[in-house]
Amino acid sequence: MFITYLLLIVAYLLGSIPFALVVGKIGYGIDIREHGSGNLGGTNTFRTLGKKAGFIVTIADILKGTLATGLPLIFSLDIHPLLFGLAAVLGHVYPIFARFRGGKAVATSAGVLLCYAPIIFAILAVVFFTLLFTTRYVSLSSMVTAIAAVIASIVNGDKIFIVAMCLLAGMVIYRHRANIGRIINKTEPKANFTKKQK
């Protein structure tokens, strides 16, 4: 039981690594919290630092969720992997290393799915990018994909999976509550990752 609690803490700490902040400060001398939306996530990194930094941060945030979800498998623990994934997402959203001001749960949640249900991850990736290229709203694409993840979990039938996806979707939508207002008011910025924004 001790190792389980220890690894849950590790999963949270792993999720707490603010890659957007690290990449911004080390690679560009910029505190990304002071630019754009101030969010420590891939979208704000794309918009503030450019495509290269955005890809690095997004992939790193995805891998946080993937590695954390895989911890019980690596250590042969008889406990549901999604608990560790949830801990990582919690860390990403409320990171102890960045004064509990983190991202919006999207990339790290995707990483959780990549480890636990890779086929569903692939399907949802198609949903996300189809919406993104159609609407150019990252926030809307993220929220709709989160809802699609809940539907996919219901089809799957695993009760823990359903609960986990409901929690993750709820977190994603909650963290995008300001974006919802801007989408309604038509003031939400659309995606443009072709160049670094000044």
Curated annotation (Swiss-Prot):
<keyword id="KW-1003">Cell membrane</keyword>
<protein>
    <recommendedName>
        <fullName>Glycerol-3-phosphate acyltransferase</fullName>
        <ecNumber>2.3.1.275</ecNumber>
    </recommendedName>
</protein>
<comment type="pathway">
    <text>Lipid metabolism; phospholipid metabolism.</text>
</comment>
<comment type="subunit">
    <text>Probably interacts with PlsX.</text>
</comment>
<feature type="transmembrane region" description="Helical">
    <location>
        <begin position="113"/>
        <end position="133"/>
    </location>
</feature>
<keyword id="KW-0443">Lipid metabolism</keyword>
<comment type="similarity">
    <text>Belongs to the PlsY family.</text>
</comment>
<dbReference type="GO" id="GO:0005886">
    <property type="term" value="C:plasma membrane"/>
</dbReference>
<keyword id="KW-0808">Transferase</keyword>
<keyword id="KW-0472">Membrane</keyword>
<keyword id="KW-0812">Transmembrane</keyword>
<feature type="transmembrane region" description="Helical">
    <location>
        <begin position="79"/>
        <end position="98"/>
    </location>
</feature>
<dbReference type="GO" id="GO:0043772">
    <property type="term" value="F:acyl-phosphate glycerol-3-phosphate acyltransferase activity"/>
</dbReference>
<keyword id="KW-0444">Lipid biosynthesis</keyword>
<feature type="transmembrane region" description="Helical">
    <location>
        <begin position="53"/>
        <end position="75"/>
    </location>
</feature>
<dbReference type="GO" id="GO:0008654">
    <property type="term" value="P:phospholipid biosynthetic process"/>
</dbReference>
<feature type="transmembrane region" description="Helical">
    <location>
        <begin position="147"/>
        <end position="167"/>
    </location>
</feature>
<comment type="function">
    <text>Catalyzes the transfer of an acyl group from acyl-phosphate (acyl-PO(4)) to glycerol-3-phosphate (G3P) to form lysophosphatidic acid (LPA). This enzyme utilizes acyl-phosphate as fatty acyl donor, but not acyl-CoA or acyl-ACP.</text>
</comment>
<keyword id="KW-1208">Phospholipid metabolism</keyword>
<keyword id="KW-1133">Transmembrane helix</keyword>
<keyword id="KW-0594">Phospholipid biosynthesis</keyword>
<feature type="transmembrane region" description="Helical">
    <location>
        <begin position="2"/>
        <end position="22"/>
    </location>
</feature>
<dbReference type="InterPro" id="IPR003811">
    <property type="entry name" value="G3P_acylTferase_PlsY"/>
</dbReference>
<dbReference type="Pfam" id="PF02660">
    <property type="entry name" value="G3P_acyltransf"/>
</dbReference>
